[in-house]
């Protein structure tokens, strides 16, 4: 039995060409205990749920379909895109509205109620040519501050709703730590962890779980031993993958 704490089902199936029906059926066959579909936009929750529902409706075996409904859950959050940062006051209100509506719609077809906030946080990694829609030149001091504010708004929302938070942090550890300490809410996961042992210690001391993503499999050989030490350092009860 296993769990998957972070995937983007709509993105996987509609943009990456992954067979969603086969994926969900395989997860059910392997007795997946828990699967969390992650939000990245203030208003993407219902669309993501609808895509999952349509796939579940294609599952011919009712027991398999029930298994999928039982293990599938949803988060809602705002990844720090430039558009979301600039319109953060409005977008956080949209996020709150969607979360409230989802709670009213809890029914037997899906676990609609949001169980975590995220992913949200800070991203200062610049891909060549702004491949992910972000360029370093776009990030002046005003935008940097807006990104921090958007992150802290979501942390406050998680505290208000008593929900865990899924942190996205890339090349921005000190700023991330500052935001966490400003809000003082420490409950959740540091997703796709990409820092070192000292940073891991600080996260663990604050109470955060640490999740390792695909980087576990493709680290450069020169850094492999360093990465192995990091994996050994994180206690098994605080380790997610």
PLM features: what roles do these ranges have?
Residues 1-241:
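Mid-domain alpha/beta scaffold segments of enzyme catalytic cores
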């Amino acid at each position: 039995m296993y769990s998957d704490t972070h995937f983007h089902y709509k993105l996987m199936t509609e943009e990456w060409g992954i067979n969603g029906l086969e994926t969900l059926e395989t997860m059910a066959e392997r007795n997946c205990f828990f699967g969390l579909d992650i939000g990245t936009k203030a208003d993407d929750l219902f669309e993501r749920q609808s895509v999952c529902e349509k796939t579940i409706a294609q599952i011919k075996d009712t027991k398999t379909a029930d298994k999928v409904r039982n293990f599938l859950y949803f988060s809602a959050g705002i990844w720090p895109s430039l558009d979301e940062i600039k319109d953060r006051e409005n977008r956080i209100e949209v996020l709150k509205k969607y979360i409230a509506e989802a709670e009213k719609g809890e029914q037997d077809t899906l676990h609609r109620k949001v169980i975590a906030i995220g992913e949200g946080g800070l991203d200062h990694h610049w891909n060549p040519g702004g491949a992910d829609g972000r360029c370093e030149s776009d990030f002046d001091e005003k935008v940097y501050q807006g990104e921090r504010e958007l992150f802290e708004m979501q942390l406050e929302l998680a505290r208000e709703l008593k929900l865990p938070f899924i942190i996205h942090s890339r090349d921005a550890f000190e700023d991330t730590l500052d935001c966490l300490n400003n809000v003082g809410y420490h409950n959740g996961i540091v997703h796709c962890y990409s820092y070192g042992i000292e940073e891991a210690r600080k996260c663990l001391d604050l109470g955060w779980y640490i999740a390792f993503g695909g980087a576990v499999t493709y680290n450069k050989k020169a850094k492999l031993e360093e990465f192995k030490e990091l994996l050994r350092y994180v206690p098994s009860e605080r380790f997610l993958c």
